[in-house]
């Protein structure tokens, strides 16, 4: 009985290469599906895996087939209903697209969309691809770690896509030379002895036969040494290394006043959860300062920021003043990259909006690397938006976006933190 031993190191992930190729090939369709799916998740379920669906029309392989129309002659085996020149009635209806829209029909056929599961890491990689903190500046002071993938020699374990053919063949050659060096040396000596014995008189037939038999056995032993073995295989190794990058702090300012209903607060929380995941995924150490405000501003921890029920009136400048105080006390602008993300419904005491403009223009914007304002409302913009519009026209490090409903959150997030090209 023959026994087969599976010595492959990635036996449980034999389709890894095909999966990676599939993700690369249909990245645009997968990202589109992810951007649609993220808005359907609960606030606390942002970072798990995801079931991704792709229309079958997008993954069909090219193929040659007969064009529609025209006349063709075919031989159909087993035909006992039609003869030459009979007209075959065209089928009613047509192939469905699997979208589930439209009226039902007893005719036609179609296919469902192709659905597959991506892991948490694949999901987050695609979710935050091509995003970065704007204007991040490196300094000579205390640093945070930003991780990037680098080549790191070779390893005996890996996936087939990373195999190093040259290094594996070098190991194979070295192993075969080491395992057969003694046998080849003995073989060479026996061949020389046989050659000398062949020229001696009288002929020593028994000795010659013995030498030939030993030579044959040695050649068979040498031939049995495998050309390549799993021990020879070497794979290109990659590791994530901490890259020196200036330390940064992100201020999250959220309006929790009475005008912010629960749906608006949930959308603001979704935005901040995306921001938190983006920072924790791409940067090792980034300080995050959470500030909630109504008529008064308060620095809180993560738990209170997302789950506290406290509410009140609206004075936006209280949050800006508190942010300035925290910066002065703990974050020297010469040593820190300072960022801020403010979310509000735009409702503010009318006399306070000009004060917000003044604080941002004179105190905060000269100190920060980037300040983003997100207004979450379906109503028309009020004085705060108009005051901020003048700041956007004056300061390059100030950005503002409008979120009307849940579907706008992820596109707005990508717009605010998309990686800037060299030309920008």
From Swiss-Prot:
It holds the Pfam family DUF444. Residues 46-109 are annotated as: Disordered. Residues 92-101 have a biased composition (Gly residues). Residues 77-90 have a biased composition (Basic and acidic residues). HAMAP family: UPF0229. Belongs to the UPF0229 family. This is UPF0229 protein PC1_1960. It comes from Pectobacterium carotovorum subsp. carotovorum (strain PC1).
